A protein has these predicted regions:
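Acyltransferase
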Residues: 174-274, 302-339
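Alpha/beta catalytic cores of group-transfer enzymes, especially the acyltransferase/condensing modules
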Residues: 81-233
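Gly/Ala-rich beta-loop-alpha elbow adjacent to hydrolase catalytic centers
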Residues: 66-74, 78, 82
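Helix-rich "cap/lid" substructures immediately adjacent to catalytic or cofactor-binding pockets
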Residues: 1-69, 153
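Short Gly/Thr/Asp-enriched flexible loops that form oxyanion-binding sites at enzyme active sites
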Residues: 271-283
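Short, hydrophobic alpha-helix immediately C-terminal to the catalytic nucleophile
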Residues: 48, 52, 78-79, 274
Length: 343
């Protein structure tokens, strides 16, 4: 409850509105777009609480990990856990600007662009986003590079439908588009510039406490795709967090190139990172057509080339991707419940 109470106080100070996150958790209230600010506070509080429980009852500290990474708000949580900033320093700018993001989200939808065969031509998709935006029917941008065959786009108004129609006419028939019906805050896209969110955030970040020491463990950033944080550049990196797309695939590649063998997923209901690694593992397993990596042979290589050319390209230059099916995944929320200690 300590972390939820602290997060509630930070929320109240930043928004001048009272919230009781402890009550919300006890009542198991669902979050929504309208309660986006509360969700931000809740997620970071739950992350901190889980890590505190892991340390207090099991003697396992965050700093025992070889490295950390997080998608979107998860990277903010990683910087807090790695003692670069206190929670208030990073949450306050986000909470102060969250209202603008929610207002922008009212006419924003997400599109998933994916391929069942070839690697996506990302520059062509980026170009189509620019072309569609120039038609003055709303801004559309890539918000995340999920994999060589998948990107997420966020678009305003009619831009999503215009993008879909043009994509269907211009791209390979193996390139598909799926529209998500929910509304999404346009974080990690240029859309937030319409409310000057990046500039306002950067001004706030200039004077927040902290940020003048390196993380206690290396953090692979979804902003840069590598371990780029040092003892003074976190503010500059975080400026780009606001309006630049997430480089999730670069992070996955980098993580698999290290010596990690277990991934501990921190926070409430983690989804995109486990899902991305699970899809990669299934793709590799189905092509290897064997019970272990030792079954990888010429026939498997041939099959990969024929059925998943995007995967073949990346395996040829980055064999470490083959480690994906061997990783052990621990959902910390579930693990803590399964190993609860009586007090």
């Amino acid at each position: 409850e300590k972390h939820l109470e602290e997060a509630s106080e930070i929320y109240t100070a930043a928004t001048l509105q009272r919230v009781d996150l402890i009550k919300r958790v006890r009542l198991r209230e669902e979050t929504s777009l309208e309660t986006y600010s509360e969700a931000v506070s809740l997620i970071t509080a739950v992350e901190a609480a889980q890590l505190a429980l892991l340390k207090e009852f099991f003697g396992i500290e965050f700093t025992q990990a070889s490295r950390a990474f997080g998608y979107s708000l998860g990277e903010i949580g990683a910087l807090i856990a790695a003692e670069v900033y206190e929670p208030e320093a990073l949450l306050t700018p986000i909470l102060k600007l969250a209202g603008d993001c929610v207002e922008l989200a009212q006419n924003i939808r997400m599109g998933i662009v994916f391929s069942r065969g070839p690697e996506l031509d990302v520059p062509a998709i980026e170009k189509l986003c620019v072309e569609t935006t120039a038609r003055n029917q709303g801004t559309i941008c890539i918000s995340s590079y999920v994999a060589p065959n998948t990107v997420l786009v966020l678009g305003q108004g009619d831009s999503i439908e215009l993008f879909r129609q043009t994509m269907k006419e211009r791209f390979n028939r193996q390139i598909h588009f799926k529209k998500n019906p929910d509304r999404w805050p346009p974080i990690h896209t240029a859309i937030v510039r319409q409310r000057n969110v990046p500039d306002r955030a950067s001004v706030m970040l200039e004077t927040v406490p902290g940020g003048m020491k390196a993380p206690t463990i290396p953090i692979i950033s979804c902003i840069t795709g590598t371990e780029s944080y040092n003892d003074y550049n976190s503010r500059q990196t975080l400026y780009d967090w606001v309006d630049h797309p997430q480089k999730l695939w670069s992070v996955i590649e980098r993580a698999l190139a290290t010596d990690i063998h277990t991934l501990i997923h921190v926070g409430p209901e983690p989804n995109i990172i486990p899902a991305t690694l699970n899809r990669l593992s299934m793709n590799i397993d189905s092509q290897l057509n064997a019970r272990s990596i030792s079954g990888f042979g010429l026939r498997a290589v041939s099959s990969i080339v024929q059925r998943r050319p995007w995967l073949a390209k990346y395996l040829s230059k980055n064999a470490s991707l083959l480690r994906a099916p061997l990783l052990e995944h621990v959902i910390l929320e579930d693990w803590l419940l399964d190993n609860a200690v009586d007090t």
